[in-house]
From Swiss-Prot:
E.C. designation(s): 2.1.1.190
Catalytic activity: uridine(1939) in 23S rRNA + S-adenosyl-L-methionine = 5-methyluridine(1939) in 23S rRNA + S-adenosyl-L-homocysteine + H(+)
Protein's name in the database: 23S rRNA (uracil(1939)-C(5))-methyltransferase RlmD
Phylogenetic lineage: Bacteria, Pseudomonadati, Pseudomonadota, Betaproteobacteria, Rhodocyclales
BP-aspect Gene Ontology terms: rRNA base methylation
Catalytic center residues: 388 (nucleophile)
Pfam families recorded: tRNA_U5-meth_tr
Amino acid sequence: MPIGKIESLDHEARGITRQEGKAIFVDGALPGETVEYASFRRKSKFELAHLVHVIKPSTARVEPCCPHFGVCGGCAMQHMEPSAQVAAKQRVLEDSLWHIGRIRPETMLPPIQGEPWGYRHRARLAVRRVSKSGGMLIGFHEWRSSYIADIRSCAILPPHVSALLMPMRELFAALSIAERIREVDVAVGEHCTALLLRILDPLTPADERLLCDFVDRNDVVFYLQPKGPDTAFRFYPSGGPRLSYTLPEFGLEFDFKPTDFTQVNHAVNRVLVRRALRLLDPQPSERIADMFCGLGNFTLPIARSGATVIGVEGSAALVRRGRESAAANGLADHVEFGVANLFECTEQSLAALGRFDKMLIDPPREGAVELVRAIGKDAPKRIVYVSCNPGTLARDAAVLVTEKGYRFVSAGAVNMFPHTAHVESIAVFELP
């Protein structure tokens, strides 16, 4: 059995060792450990391997909290002490910036982190009927598999949501559409918890009674979605608490639907918004752009400063709700929202929006390379970039520095998803 010394973690939280110049990626191994491993896939330049035995453990190794860890794909790092996870993600960010973009920030910001358990306020859970038993499986997919993990509880979900996993199995198994249920979305707000069920066929009266009884027993709200995301509607109860989240520091509340993108981790999102605003430093006299603005998670806090803000987003539905949130929070006079496909941005289309003193960019995983390449002679003097993919951040940062003349002032990791390999980050760029 081959033995290796683990050097570091890759972007999927696999340990990396080397044998005769070839990289070996070992599931479950931690930096500094000496391990036995067994390769299950061999390529000319690398191998993928399973961990067989830890000969010399890392001081960061801990016993996983969850009995499903190692099978369930919802987490990848429970065997690593939480502060060590954050440090590893900071290193992944630094490595990505250098190896992909060939750039380094002048300063590394301290990472943003929060509670490691019960943080996941939004989740899409897979559902499948088990033909032999007639029961249902509900949970995340197994590690690198299309199968659904047989989980009875989940430590990264809020406790009251984890407690719904088994009752949901019983509910879905009893529905006439049980065979055709593929997933259920969970969205936790300040005042209520919503479950969203995609239905391809109409519910029977008996199905509707079962859903209503489940709601009454478990204090949740059920949404149904017969077709695309815009068809989702609140099924039961028709009234009651709204699904919303708050940014108390800015006196803001955002209503949303289970189909809307919102940050998974409410506590870390509050810290992230606070840091983004501190780094952006909006002033009442400034005109600021919030690109990929979504519901206005950053737009409305910027508007609280008195600056004039333009929020740009590709989804007309999100822009509509952003306008509603601005009005509900008394900020309609400070905010303008517009619909634009920022993945097809040109210098001409960006210039048509007018001159901006500063810009905040919060793109999806694909990044914002078209947008940053479109920045012309009236470039914003400061850009704060919130990223959910270190690779595309590194690519876009290289464009800003080498092609657009920005200084790469600072960057730091954001641990939005504890116990996973997912790395979010925030970066600041300034013109000299």
